[in-house]
């Protein structure tokens, strides 16, 4: 994540669209009437002042369904927890990884079993380290 430029949610940001109902993944059925309004910000963002959007740069997290070019939603108000996916700052660089917490030890785990280039990062007291925010959603282009 060398191009670390978060996109912040403004307090008046809203994106509302019509929710048409459920769609069957099997045999198609005729479209139903509009059931309700769907506000994507209300659905995807719990803490507007602490939520940011990032575009994924790289392939170290593909096994967690974070592919290059996807948008991740990161909430800084959520306390990190074991095995959460998070944007972390370590030694001057930002990265997104799965955070493994084992007692007082922290490891940043990549999720790409097909590429041995990505190895776990053991966080030590010598590292400059913070968990910047927890990933809450991934928005994918199909």
Regions found by a protein language model. Give the residues of each.
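Short, positionally conserved secondary-structure boundary motifs
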Residues: 1-62, 101, 128, 137-142
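Structural motif
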Residues: 69-70, 84
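Hydrophobic beta-strand signal
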Residues: 73-74, 87
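Short, compositionally biased
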Residues: 82-96, 100-106
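Glycine- and charge-enriched low-complexity intrinsically disordered segments
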Residues: 101-142
């Amino acid at each position: 994540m060398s191009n670390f430029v978060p996109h912040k949610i403004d307090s008046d940001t809203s994106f509302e669209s019509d929710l048409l109902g459920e769609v069957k993944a099997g045999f198609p059925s005729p479209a139903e009437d509009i059931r309700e309004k769907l506000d994507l910000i209300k659905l995807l963002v719990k803490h507007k002042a602490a939520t940011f959007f990032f575009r994924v740069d790289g392939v170290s997290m593909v096994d967690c369904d974070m592919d290059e070019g996807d948008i991740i939603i990161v909430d800084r108000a959520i306390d990190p927890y074991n095995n959460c996916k998070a944007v972390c700052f370590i030694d001057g660089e930002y990265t997104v990884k799965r955070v493994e917490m084992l007692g007082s030890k922290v490891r940043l785990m990549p999720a790409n079993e097909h590429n041995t280039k990505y190895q776990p990062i053991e966080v030590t007291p010598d590292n400059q380290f913070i968990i910047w925010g927890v990933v809450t959603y991934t928005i994918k282009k199909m």
